[in-house]
Amino acid sequence: MAAFGIKSKIFQIMEMTILFLFAISIDRYCFAADEDMLQDVCVADLHSKVKVNGFPCKTNFTAADFSSFAISKPGATNNKFGSKVTTANVEQVPGLNTLGVSLARIDYAPGGINPPHTHPRASEMVFVMEGELDVGFITTANVLVSKQITKGEVFVFPRGLVHFQKNNGKIPAAVVSAFNSQLPGTQSIPITLFGASPTVPDDVLAQTFQINIEDVQQIKSKFAPAKKF
């Protein structure tokens, strides 16, 4: 009986330890989008052949690795969407590696749109520098949360939710976006579905959107994958 009691206590301790470790892991993922930094700086070696979740550290770095004019000028908006996203993430600012933050600038022509998209690795906060925008995100319960925002205003898009911005004004608009990830990633819904390479099967898209295959092919022609040379 004594031996049984000892074993029972051991199992109780093991259960408590497992639950404690599980709680820690849940807490970690609730508050962090990227892995925590383990050293003062880890400037990304963007040319390394080593593949890790992130980028390996460069041996030598300078102040230039922590600085960039990437978003200092408006982006060209003469395209099919009338908008341009210019990023300042770890790929432009190697010093952001392991820091869990990045920025982007988005410029919109009058009538321009940043079409529905998601950021799988980050939440986003936009600050309106010029103009006004109709913005919104859609919850997993298919509820649209939308608002018109103007110069000086901020708006938050939760991580992973589909969202958009549309300039319905008569003048250009611009925002700065902040992310809690060094590389938030972007999936544009129309481009992802109709411009993937290899292409998503026509019958899949036809049944999904309840349209015929000819319509699918017509839409795909507008989002043809870019040729790789």
Swiss-Prot record:
Mn(2+) binds at residues 117, 119, 124, 163. It catalyses: 2 superoxide + 2 H(+) = H2O2 + O2. Residues 1-32 form the signal peptide. SUPFAM superfamilies: RmlC-like cupins (SSF51182). Its main location: secreted. Monomer. In the absence of manganese, it forms tetrameric and pentameric forms which show superoxide dismutase activity. This is Nectarin-1. The gene is NEC1.
